[in-house]
Amino acid sequence: MKLMFASDIHGNAYFCNKLKEAYNKEQPEKLILLGDLLYNKSLLSFGRNNERQKTAGILNDLMDYIIAVRGNCDTDLDQALLYFPIMSDYKKLNVDGYEFFITHGHLYNKYHLPPSDKKVILIHGHTHVPVSYTHLRAHETKANL
């Protein structure tokens, strides 16, 4: 299954349109949104709250393909503007035999791993920096990954 991940859009309609273009080009089966979708304090302070509605409209066009979790900036108002659920702190997905734990990153991250007794792929945003890492639990070695 082909997946696309995005995080920390923060109500930026321009970059949300870029995301939609990439989604339409790549045609993944699911778009996984890792939180902080609409809220942007700087947009509100400059009287550009309509960016929030524009961004919501762009995302709502893709609602049938979206799986989303709550970011630390997502609010009940954001949920009211979106036609898909965003208020879960995390979701677990099984994709092609792989266990994914998707979250925003403010609650679970490489420093505070999610509770699990099996191997999971932790996917999160929040840092605004793309990075990949492998973490071994105490009972694991690279040989049994």
Description of each model-found segment:
Residues L77-L82, H112-D117, V131-Y133:
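Short loop/helix-cap segments at secondary-structure boundaries that form the rim of catalytic
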Residues D64-I67, E99-F100, V120-I121:
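Short active-site oxyanion
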Residues I9, I102-L107, V120-P130:
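Histidine-centered catalytic micro-motifs
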Residues K2-V95:
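Core catalytic region of metal-dependent phosphoesterases/phosphodiesterases
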Residues T134-T141:
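Conserved small/polar residues in nucleotide/adenosyl-binding loops
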Residues D89, K118-V120:
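A generic structural signal for short beta-strands and their flanking turns/coil linkers
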